[in-house]
Regions:
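Basic, nucleic-acid-interacting segments
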Residues: 1-225
Length: 225
């Protein structure tokens, strides 16, 4: 007899915030410029620079939280996340760890999924929305890789869902609803061809009816342009 398993899916959506300038400097928030031409000492992390938070990015992240029924923090802070990767020119990222701007939200899904099958009318929980800076971008040319740091420092929301989805259809419906919400509120263009909305997917399997989570597999950087 076949064992009845179910998928448990959670999503991390990375959404660029539509602002005039980058997160911590006055460089313009643009797309499509020649590589490594939209840079300054702050977004390159030169010694002695003093980053200043972008008020517009903070306000729009709070608006995103309100649109998703989140609790808005009365006190929040930024942290340095240190790691070494070619697209992270500073070798650290300014992000939020234990005090995000928004937490405990939800997104409503209903209707049909991409397969055409009807979806359950349900809410997908949202763990948190925190604000950070986007890293640079790797461009691959045959056997060579070039680094474009123009994207470095663009304000980026990381929107983390609860593991409440049970199918690819539900995950698709959640992302469609999230994208429509961000576009409607003017928070982001969510142009996936420009990398303005990207996803990491966390998937595990368990016997249907169980509550314990299984071993998680993470699929990173879906729809990264």
């Amino acid at each position: 007899m076949a064992v009845n398993y179910e998928a448990v899916i959670g999503l991390e959506a990375h959404v660029q915030v539509r602002t005039k300038s980058k997160m911590f400097c006055k460089c313009p928030n643009t797309h499509g410029a020649e590589p490594n031409t939209v840079l300054c000492p702050i977004c390159m992390g030169y010694p002695g620079v003093l980053p200043t938070p972008n008020r517009e990015a903070i306000n729009k992240t709070v608006a995103a939280g309100l649109m998703c029924s989140c609790e808005i923090a009365l006190k929040s802070k930024f942290d340095r996340k240190s790691y070494f990767y070619p697209d992270l020119v500073k070798n650290y990222q300014i992000t939020q760890y234990d005090q995000p701007l928004c937490k405990n939200g939800k997104i409503h899904i209903h209707g049909t999924g991409f397969s055409g099958e009807p979806l359950p009318d349900k809410y997908i929980g949202m763990t948190r929305i925190h604000l950070e800076e986007d890293p640079g971008k790797s461009n691959h040319f045959g056997n060579c890789t070039g680094m474009d740091y123009n994207r470095s420092g663009i304000p980026l929301m990381e929107i983390v869902s609860e593991p409440d989805m049970r199918s690819a259809d539900e995950a698709y419906a959640y992302l469609v609803a999230l994208r429509q919400t961000m576009q409607y509120a003017g928070i982001s263009d969510c142009d996936m061809e420009k990398g303005q909305m990207r996803f990491d997917v966390n998937i595990s399997m368990r016997l249907r009816g169980e509550t314990k989570l299984g071993t998680k597999v993470e699929i990173k950087n879906l729809n990264d342009s």
